[in-house]
């Protein structure tokens, strides 16, 4: 009585499973589900780097639900592929009807991403292209990230430059097919991603030609590739101007590389 008890919450960090771990998890969650003979969990495990155990469980559950809705007696590769797409990008927007012209534009946009990605050296292979609206996206191009890159979290300058070119491939395709005046707002998220990657290359990863191997700004939070974070400025206006200039140059080079493809 009268004593104080302090309870401190502990946080346990669980790493995302590697290929072997994903294969085992898929095997566990496949129990009780009737899979078609040509469904290979080994291939599914290789297509899902970065997935958590919960993601994998959700994937197989979604595939089983899709099979039931389609009045199928077993889960086929089609249901697996559709479930992967759903887990990655959200449910299909069935109420969003696209005109033939819009569908064609989205197809060109996504083909631009895929083509640039396929022709960039040592880039992630294209897994699937879809023009089915999901979430806020009119279409999506899926790449299969390298297992080694995902596990190590290490990305080279060349890879990041390729990534920016691939992200700009959709807008470039629109410009080539429809002309500069008909480029749409569909590349908005792509442009944000490219700008974020370029800025991190300069201010976080020490990949600046002008400033050298330095990290600028005191980050507030963890580092996630492709996601901008808040940072306290600890550099001058002159340095800020140099950063903006280099970011612009990196984006311009990436756009030209995508155009040349």
Task: Label each PLM-derived region with a short phrase.
Residues 55, 112-113:
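Short hydrophobic/aromatic residue motifs in ordered secondary structure
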Residues 1-7:
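Short, small-residue-biased leader/transition segments that mark boundaries at the very start
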Residues 11-81, 90-91, 95, 167-175, ...:
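Conserved C-terminal "switch" segment of AAA+ ATPases
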